[in-house]
Structures are given as structure tokens and as C-alpha cells.
Amino acid sequence: MNRTLLVIIFSLFVSACSSTSGFSIPEVAQPAPKIQFENLHLRGVFNWWEATSAYQFKKDSNGWYVNVELIADGQPYDFRLSDAIWTPSQSCGGNYKGQPVMVSTKIFLVCKQGSENLQFTPSNTGIYRFQIAPADDNEVSLVITR
């Protein structure tokens, strides 16, 4: 009898140690990393998607900019913004693939893994300025001017 009681108590102790409770500690959402504008490059078909100094954003009083010479041949240029190593939180693009960008129209880019390429089709051959600035919720505003 004592032996049976001992086995029952031991079994209860072992099963209590291996069971999980219904309580779990919630995970705290980490804030999105801040966009490092000084490290961003304009990357697209016009520069073979490379991060070169000619396409690195420069600071001015209106934010950050890059001037690019584009040929108006009726074909869209795919592009996006990213640092030199395509860090997901530092790669900015559209909400959907091929999102169009128009001259002098502000759009907001998302900076996260899964952002998509943007498209710009110049109406005239010439130099275009890609101007970016910080926006809300880890977004970047973009305006292309001529």
C-alpha cells in the first residue's frame, strides 16, 4: 500500500513538472529600425541595381536627393531605394509590384522586406531629381522632378 501511494505521488510530481500552464508571456514588438538616409542609394535598371556613389542620396535643405539622366524611350524604369547590402529595413519601395511614380507627385514608400519595385516612365529625355524625405510610420516620401 505504501509502495502504491509512493508511486502515485511520484507520478503526480513528474507530470506536474512536465505540464505547461495556459499563461504565456507576450512578446514585445520591437520598433522598426530608423531609416539611415545617408546610406541609401537609388538602385534600378539605369545603374544595373548597383549601389554606386553616383546614385547615393545627398542631403540638402529639402531632404535627400539624387540627380539621374534618363532617356525617354517609352519604357518604364524599375527602381527602388536601398543601402549597399539590401538590408530589409533599409530597402524602400512600393506596396505593390510596378507601382507607378509620376513627375511632381508625392508618393510614400514602405521600407521593409517585401516592398516592391517602383516604375517611372520619363516623358522627356533629361536629368530628373529623385527627392526623398522622412515620413510617418517608417515610410519615406518621394517626389521626382525635372
What label would you give each PLM region?
Residues F13-A16:
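C-terminal motif of bacterial Sec signal peptides marking the signal peptidase cleavage site
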Residues E38-L42, S141-R146:
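Extended low-complexity, serine/threonine- and proline-enriched intrinsically disordered segments
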Residues S82-A84, A135:
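Beta-strand-rich extracellular modules
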Residues N2-I8:
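Sec-dependent signal peptide recognition
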Residues Q119-T145:
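Short, exposed beta-strand-loop hairpins at the edges of beta-sheets
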Residues Q75-Y77, Y128:
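Exposed beta-strand face motif in extracellular beta-rich ectodomains
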Residues S18-S21:
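Bacterial signal peptide processing site
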Residues A32-G74, A84-V110:
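Aromatic-rich carbohydrate-binding modules that target alpha-glucans
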